Amino acid sequence: MAKGKRDKIRMISSAATGHFYTTDKNKKNTPGKMEMMKYDPVVRKHVMYKEGKIK
């Protein structure tokens, strides 16, 4: 069976709260690590989330 075009990733909060979002990304269009501002409900602020592996 062929490998899919999208990888599942985990967006980990840079506020060190342990909160994360799971999403997927297209390997071909975004080969680098993703970073985005998202809401962290633990600190109740928008913080930078960085891509990490799903274990």
Swiss-Prot record:
InterPro entries reported in the protein's UniProt record: Ribosomal_bL33, Ribosomal_bL33_CS, Ribosomal_bL33_sf, Ribosomal_zn-bd
Gene3D superfamilies: Ribosomal protein L33
Disulfide bonds: none
GO cellular component: cytosolic large ribosomal subunit
GO BP annotation list: translation
Domain of life of the native organism: Bacteria
Species in which this protein is naturally found: Xanthomonas campestris pv. campestris (strain ATCC 33913 / DSM 3586 / NCPPB 528 / LMG 568 / P 25)
Protein name: Large ribosomal subunit protein bL33
Keywords noted in UniProt: Ribonucleoprotein, Ribosomal protein
Assigned protein family: Belongs to the bacterial ribosomal protein bL33 family.
